[in-house]
């Protein structure tokens, strides 16, 4: 651990930026909110693709909450909640720096899940992401917490990003809203030569078949990364909403972990 950044060597800086943990070939991470586990998607040049699980200790940084009416400022209620949610409090070193003393001076951890950490604050009357609390509580997403705590880095071991198997897709729709439109084309392409355009007529059966085919292709190709232009905000929600409207059983779609 670097005690003073001013005295850090080139090797220490490199280790800090690139992650000191030696594990290689992690290309993606998913967090299971039900299980509290991290799912590591790995693409090893020798062993091939695999999914491994790992755990971490959820944490956040917290400042002075004495004026926040946290659990009505009742110490007994706070301690009871700490027991319920497995909370551990660590005081951080601030030295003689006045700015640090006025900042986030506590590391809050839980022996339970990320949800328990969030619930600890919400049940005490504080929304960790609320406008009034952003300066007092900082909770990172589970994936970021895992990478920081375990000192790991994505894509370590790859000289070129093109070595990672990627798939991109795009939906063509008749409207911006799935409630009054339909999918009439799905384009799929990966960086290893696969290309497919699924054309769909105006019959519901054709759209249903195309959606199932899309997920079957993903399962067959098994790309390490799936992406698209604004896909998380448009294509994926659109796809699942159309499946719902068409009466499809989305549990039949082959995913990373059907139990999550």
Question: Which stretches of residues belong to each language-model region?
Answer:
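The two-metal-ion catalytic cores of nucleic-acid processing enzymes
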Residues: 1-260
């Amino acid at each position: 651990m670097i005690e003073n950044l001013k005295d850090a060597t080139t090797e220490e800086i490199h280790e800090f930026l690139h992650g000191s943990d030696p594990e290689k070939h992690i290309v993606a991470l998913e967090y299971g909110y039900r299980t509290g586990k991290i799912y590591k998607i790995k693409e090893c040049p020798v062993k091939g693709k695999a999914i491994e699980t790992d755990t971490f200790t959820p944490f956040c940084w917290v400042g002075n909450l004495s004026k926040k009416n946290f659990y009505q400022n009742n110490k007994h209620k706070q301690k009871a909640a700490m027991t319920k949610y497995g909370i551990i409090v660590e005081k951080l070193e601030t030295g003689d720096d006045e700015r640090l003393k006025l900042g986030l001076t506590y590391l809050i951890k839980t022996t339970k899940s990320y949800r328990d950490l969030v619930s600890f604050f919400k049940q005490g009357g504080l929304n960790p992401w609320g406008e009034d609390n952003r300066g007092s509580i900082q909770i990172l997403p589970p994936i970021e917490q895992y990478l920081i705590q375990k000192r790991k880095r994505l894509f370590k071991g790859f000289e070129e990003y093109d070595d990672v198997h990627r798939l991109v897709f795009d939906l063509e729709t008749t409207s911006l809203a799935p409630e009054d439109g339909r999918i009439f084309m799905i384009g799929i392409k990966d960086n290893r030569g696969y290309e497919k355009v699924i054309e769909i007529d105006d019959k519901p059966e054709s759209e249903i078949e195309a959606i199932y085919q899309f997920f079957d292709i993903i399962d067959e190709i098994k790309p390490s990364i799936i992406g698209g232009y604004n896909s998380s905000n448009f294509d994926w929600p659109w796809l699942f909403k159309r499946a719902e409207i068409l009466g499809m059983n989305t549990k039949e779609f082959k995913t990373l972990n059907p139990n999550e």
